[in-house]
Structures are given as C-alpha cells and as structure tokens.
Amino acid sequence: MTRLTLALDVMGGDFGPSVTVPAALQALNSNSQLTLLLVGNPDAITPLLAKADFEQRSRLQIIPAQSVIASDARPSQAIRASRGSSMRVALELVKEGRAQACVSAGNTGALMGLAKLLLKPLEGIERPALVTVLPHQQKGKTVVLDLGANVDCDSTMLVQFAIMGSVLAEEVVEIPNPRVALLNIGEEEVKGLDSIRDASAVLKTIPSINYIGYLEANELLTGKTDVLVCDGFTGNVTLKTMEGVVRMFLSLLKSQGEGKKRSWWLLLLKRWLQKSLTRRFSHLNPDQYNGACLLGLRGTVIKSHGAANQRAFAVAIEQAVQAVQRQVPQRIAARLESVYPAGFELLDGGKSGTLR
C-alpha cells in the first residue's frame, strides 16, 4: 500500500478536537501507511495526543491555524474571512501538494466555496457535488448525489453528476456497469421538473451510462439502482430523513420493553430479538457511512457530518483514503473526455422548471 498524507480540519464540527483528534488516532491504528496533518489550535490539539504512542506521533503533525469558520456563518461571509482558518489551511495543504486529501466536519457551504476556489473544478464540471455511499436492504450499496452542495441544479449539472457518480460506483464501490437513476416524484416520463426530464433525455443518449430511468424516494434502500442523482436540496432532505428513521428504529430496538415487568422467558426472547435485529440492520447505522465526497474537483475533499462521533469521523477519514487510492478525480476527468471528446457542452442551459 502506498503512503498517504491527509489534512484534517480538526476544529470543524459540533465537537471539534474532542472527537476529531481521537478519530485521527483510531485511523492511524487502522492504517500503517497513513500520515495525518492536524490543522487547528495547537493548545486544543496537544493535550488530546497524550495517549498517542511514539509510532503514532511519528505519523502526526500539527499545522497551526488561527481561527475556525462558524457552522452558522453564511458561505460568502465565511469565505471572505477564511484566511488563517483551519478549513482553509487544510485545503491549501491539498492545493500545495503537501496532502492528498482534506477531511472536514465544518460549515458545508464554506467548504464547498473554498474547495471550488482553491482546488478548482475539473474541466467539464460546472459545480462539485456532495456524494455518499449508502447501504441498501440487499446488503449492497448505492451512490447518492448531490447531498447539499447545490440547492438548485439545471439539467446539465444533473447529467454531470450522473457521470461522476457512475465513475465512483465503478472505481470505489466496485460495481461493474452501475445502474443510474434520477430521483423523481414518479416513474412516468412526464413526471417531474423540466430539469429532470431534460437530463433524462440526455442520459439516454450516453452509451457509457447504464441509465434506467426514474426512481421514487421510497425505493432508495431497495437496491434497484446503483447511482441515484438529484439536486442538493432534495438529496439533503432525503438523506437526513432516512438517517432519522434509521436512528429511531435502532433506538426502539434497544429500548423496547424497558421499565415493564415481564416473565423471565419473555425477557430472554426480547434480548435475543434485540441482538438478532440489531445485527441484521447494523449496516444501516448512519455512523458506518459518514463522509460525503465533494466530487468534481481537482483534488479530494471529504465532508463529515457536523454531529459525527469519533467512530463516524474515523469512517470519513477512511473514505478519503479510498478516494485517493482509487484516483477518483483523475478517473472522472478521463470519463468526461471519453464521453464528450469534442467538448463539454451537454445542454443549452436547461433550467429547473415547474412540476407536472
């Protein structure tokens, strides 16, 4: 395995270094070829490294940063005031070639804007998209994008997302000839926004995309598609709704019957069912798929959930490792060139319209 260096914005997220630094140590234990640059306030980071052994410390470096971008800051304001912030410094390390990827749990809008400013989109990509890999009931995985980087998307962007998602499904998830679908309010051709229907028409003409049509939100976890494409507003709401339902379900499994008097055999049956069902559905736990890749840039950027715990942030670090190892940006660029050798104009500016 090739040695990798990642830059971590350890100050970002709801819990900052108290979660990100222990997660960094966990990631180092799991990968002997990994070096981590911890970007943030040294006074906040150093005490949390007390339990790190000599070998771990040899693969850690603290990169000082003067400030933190607030989670509630407007993206435009955050970008203007970003110099010296932990997020910007981490991204600059990628731009300078000192790190191969950046991981942050900070402000999504600021991360999107700064990454686009510093790392630049690939040729043929208008705007990057946030993408994650979700488990489904068939024990497989589905690539979903956009998850919030772009609230409003025209048809051209949706087609670009489909191309990028298809590459990620092939190269990282290792799904041959992945099926691609557009998230819509129905499966009929006439349903949905103009942007969705226009994107559908274009995807049907691209031989390298295994486009299967529309998919409704209630089929997200069924395994009917390998790549699901949507605008960022829809994707973000869909993802958070799904996460909330899964967390509620797992919580109910653990708490069912608490505080009630039951016979000993009912208690044994309850415990057996809890363990069995928890094992059966543990792959749906949101902590196990934390980390959305900002796809479409000339570098690798992973956005962790702001409320991620130690385990979840360590998963986001692993997502960055996989993206770098599989050379995702380079492979997307190659796919775009093969699909559109004469240029990258896909549509004549198709805009989102009204529902039908």
From Swiss-Prot:
Pathways involved: Lipid metabolism; phospholipid metabolism
Pfam families: FA_synthesis
A GO-annotated cellular component: cytoplasm
Main location, first listed in the record: cytoplasm
One Gene Ontology molecular-function label: phosphate:acyl-[acyl carrier protein] acyltransferase activity
One GO process term, biological-process aspect: fatty acid biosynthetic process
Cell membrane recorded as keyword: no
InterPro entries from the UniProt entry: FA_synthesis, Phospholipid_synth_PlsX-like
Name of the top EC class for this enzyme: transferase
Recorded catalytic activity of this chain's protein: a fatty acyl-[ACP] + phosphate = an acyl phosphate + holo-[ACP]
UniProt keyword Lipid biosynthesis, yes or no: yes
Subcellular location as annotated: Cytoplasm
UniProt keyword annotations, A-Z: Cytoplasm, Lipid biosynthesis, Lipid metabolism, Phospholipid biosynthesis, Phospholipid metabolism, Transferase
Gene3D superfamilies the UniProt entry points to: Isopropylmalate Dehydrogenase
EC number: 2.3.1.274
SUBUNIT field: Homodimer. Probably interacts with PlsY.
Summary of the function given for this chain in its UniProt record: Catalyzes the reversible formation of acyl-phosphate (acyl-PO(4)) from acyl-[acyl-carrier-protein] (acyl-ACP). This enzyme utilizes acyl-ACP as fatty acyl donor, but not acyl-CoA.
Family: Belongs to the PlsX family.
Matches recorded under NCBIfam families: plsX (TIGR00182)
Protein name in UniProt: Phosphate acyltransferase
Species for this entry: Escherichia coli O1:K1 / APEC
Taxonomic path: Bacteria, Pseudomonadati, Pseudomonadota, Gammaproteobacteria, Enterobacterales
Protein's gene: plsX
